[in-house]
Amino acid sequence: TEVSRSCYLSNGKWPVSCIIRVPVGAYGSGGPYHSSSVESVLSNIRGIKIVYPSNGADMKGLMKAAYHDPNPVVVLEHKGLYWSKVKGTEAAKVVEPDGDYIIPLGKARIALAASKDRVDHGQTLFVVTYGMGVHWALNAAKNYPGQIEILDLRCIAPLDEEAIYAGAEKHGRVLVVTEEPVNSSFAQSIAARIQQQCFKFLDAPVTTIGAANLPAIPLSEVLEREMLLSAEKVAAEMGKVLG
């Protein structure tokens, strides 16, 4: 806690610039020891910054921003996205936008845009997600051409609330996707904020989908798949919200 508060309490006189890289996420039947997602725990530590890239280019740009930040930055790295080891994550392999670039902390990106015609007819859904959730959403969106817009948060803290609320107001239907169990999660807090800030623009309650609410991820690969999200589960939830 001292490290996270140092820059703030000293008014910038004692910055603590450090990068803490944390491999996270379920991959390869790691069970309860190596498969957890911890963004909800970390997001309650005031003073630290948290990034969660979904592709290689974002990883580099966010790491460089973290290097220059005067506060501790935790970089969450999903193990299944290393070399796109998990089927359906080919989009994690991207070409660098430039030889030297920095992605500002707290700046989300549109990973997939909905078609203007669908937006004008009120037939779209806004998906807010990050990390592996981006790839589940991208694959699930293939079932609803032009109807899905996906916001890749890239940063857990600071959070790009402006982009979140703008998307919610534009589309009227919102689905928040996380790998964590939903109860008491960071994703659920996003849904609550959207509901509070954008209520008059919503056509349906904000929905959150994540892993089953179990104490730990099973060692069994079969049970692991049953507990975790997948593109198929996300697609089914998209259909429910779209009606």
Model-derived regions: residue spans:
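Alpha-helical scaffold elements adjacent to nucleotide-binding pockets in ATP/GTP-utilizing enzyme cores
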Residues: 1-2, 37, 41, 189-193, ...
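Thiamine diphosphate
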Residues: 1-21, 27, 79-80, 84-243
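Short secondary-structure boundary micro-motifs
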Residues: 4, 34-36, 92-93, 211
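Conserved thiamine diphosphate
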Residues: 8-69, 237, 242
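Residue-level signal for secondary-structure boundary elements
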Residues: 11, 71-74, 202
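Helix-enriched interaction subdomains in cytosolic or periplasmic regions
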Residues: 47-51, 57-98
